[in-house]
Amino acid sequence: MVMGLGLFLLVFLLGLGLTPPTLALDNPRYRDFLTKHYDATPQGRNDRYCESKMRKLGLTSPCKAINTFIHGNSRHIKAICRDENGNPYGENLRISKSPFQVTTCNLRGGSPRPPCRYRATAGFRNIVVACENDLPVHLDQSIFRP
């Protein structure tokens, strides 16, 4: 009986440790944020990267004018919504304490109709996000740091 209770307690505690990431992925706005703005290990970070990535995400019908991809560790992005890596910024926004590697894809030409051609701008920037339940749900802007 004691062995069974100990095993149950161990499984319960392990379950608690696994719950937060699972709950985070259950948030549809956070999942949408990651889909549209997160790419851990980009290939290229050039115009071709932008055109391929935007097409894969379905952001080319109509052509989205601008989109920024954040690269690196998603835990650091989530930490912007807490004091760990973020500060209040404006009304209901948070700015990262540290810069992130990003690629911004800007639509070339004026037409929102495909084929979409993008110009890539790669760099390190502090990012501004809107948070919901300590999770980023909207990328407001990115700020170049000198």
Curated annotation (Swiss-Prot):
Activity regulation (record text): Has weak tRNA ribonuclease activity by itself due to partial autoinhibition by its C-terminus, which folds into a short alpha-helix that partially occludes the substrate-binding site. In absence of stress, the ribonuclease activity is inhibited by RNH1 in the cytoplasm. In response to stress, dissociates from RNH1 in the cytoplasm and associates with cytoplasmic ribosomes with vacant A-sites: ribosomes directly activate the tRNA ribonuclease activity of ANG by refolding the C-terminal alpha-helix. In response to stress, the angiogenic activity of ANG is inhibited by RNH1 in the nucleus.
Residues binding tRNA: 45, 105, 127
GO MF: actin binding; copper ion binding; DNA binding; endonuclease activity; heparin binding; protein homodimerization activity; RNA nuclease activity; signaling receptor binding
Location within or outside the cell: Secreted; Nucleus; Nucleus, Nucleolus; Cytoplasm, Stress granule
Main subcellular location: secreted
Motif Nucleolar localization signal, residue range(s) on this chain: 55-59
EC number(s) recorded for this UniProt protein: 3.1.27.-
Paired cysteines (S-S): 50-105, 63-116, 81-131
Biological processes per GO annotation: actin filament polymerization; angiogenesis; antibacterial humoral response; antimicrobial humoral immune response mediated by antimicrobial peptide; defense response to Gram-positive bacterium; hematopoietic stem cell proliferation; innate immune response; negative regulation of apoptotic process
Family: Belongs to the pancreatic ribonuclease family.
PANTHER family the UniProt entry points to: ANGIOGENIN (PTHR11437:SF60), RIBONUCLEASE (PTHR11437)
Job of this protein: Secreted ribonuclease that can either promote or restrict cell proliferation of target cells, depending on the context. Endocytosed in target cells via its receptor PLXNB2 and translocates to the cytoplasm or nucleus. Under stress conditions, localizes to the cytoplasm and promotes the assembly of stress granules (SGs): specifically cleaves a subset of tRNAs within anticodon loops to produce tRNA-derived stress-induced fragments (tiRNAs), resulting in translation repression and inhibition of cell proliferation. tiRNas also prevent formation of apoptosome, thereby promoting cell survival.
Designated name of the protein: Angiogenin
Protein species of origin: Colobus guereza (Mantled guereza)
Gene name as annotated: ANG
